[in-house]
Amino acid sequence: MNKKLKVLLTNDDGIFAKGISLLVSNLLKADFADLYIVAPNTEQSGKSMSFSYTEPVSIERVDYHQPVAGAWAVSGSPVDCIKLALGDLFLDSLPDIVLSGINNGSNAGRNIFYSGTAGAAMEAVISGIPAIAFSQEEHISCFQEKKSCELIKMLVLYALSRPFPLLTGFNVNFPACENNEEWQGMKLVATGKEFAYGVPRLLCDDGKRKFYSLNDCQRLMDEDLSEECHSLLTKKITVAPLLVRNSPLGLMSEEEFQQLQQEFEDFIHSEIRS
């Protein structure tokens, strides 16, 4: 690749979170892109595609601890970050692709409806820019950094190889591996039906008001696991087309999606051989 790509990075865990730093490390190691960060100045998990409609937001250039081309912190949601980046900061020189994450925790199944990580990627696609949302199942400490550099580069090149706007957004989940287990390849899947259901937990009651925590949740799974969930359980990295309608099967037949899966496998194998 003669000319380096222009890559915009964001997340919902905050600009100085471990996950986005790991993503920067991998991209620097691959050395095929100039990196720009526009991310929230505080954690914005669960923001989905919300944006600051009723109040102003600020953006401030910050010193970042890794050699990126520039980094800005935003006092708003992940979608605010994308709106400011594409609508002002880089309006005259748009990025080739937006990468969001790496999120601390899974964003598989219907959880993507809540995810600020996925929300930022969807905002990019809606705005005409290819995007990938990355999440690490369970905890960011499970991420296998030594094995991820070429995988992330391949996924970026795959997303850029797709004709816009057909399936140019993707939601990637890395499985959690234990006891020296390794990732067992990548698989293109449809977004699963599983979701995390939380029961409100009462914190206190002062007689006038009750205070609750809504962060207690667990993944609910049917006996008939989705392909996405089954792939993660068998330690495969899942790559799900990221659409506002949430499922590629609403736009194509099952046979057409199976053909897309085969094309994805062929692309990955050709990149590994090259």
Curated annotation (Swiss-Prot):
Matches recorded under InterPro entries: SurE, SurE-like_Pase/nucleotidase, SurE-like_sf
Subcellular location(s) of the protein: Cytoplasm
UniProt protein name: 5'-nucleotidase SurE
UniProt superkingdom: Bacteria
Gene (name only): surE
An annotated Gene Ontology molecular function: metal ion binding
Catalytic activity reported: a ribonucleoside 5'-phosphate + H2O = a ribonucleoside + phosphate
Record organism: Chlamydia felis (strain Fe/C-56) (Chlamydophila felis)
UniProt: a divalent metal cation binding residues: D12, D13, S45, N103
One Pfam family this sequence matches: SurE
Cofactor(s) this protein cannot do without: a divalent metal cation
Predominant location category: cytoplasm
Record's function text: Nucleotidase that shows phosphatase activity on nucleoside 5'-monophosphates.
UniProt cross-references to HAMAP family, sorted A to Z: SurE (MF_00060)
Alphabetized UniProt keyword annotations: Cytoplasm, Hydrolase, Metal-binding, Nucleotide-binding
PANTHER family in alphabetical order: 5'-NUCLEOTIDASE SURE, 5'_3'-NUCLEOTIDASE SURE
E.C. number(s) listed in UniProt: 3.1.3.5
GO cellular component terms given for this protein: cytoplasm
Broad enzyme group: hydrolase
Similarity comment text for this entry: Belongs to the SurE nucleotidase family.
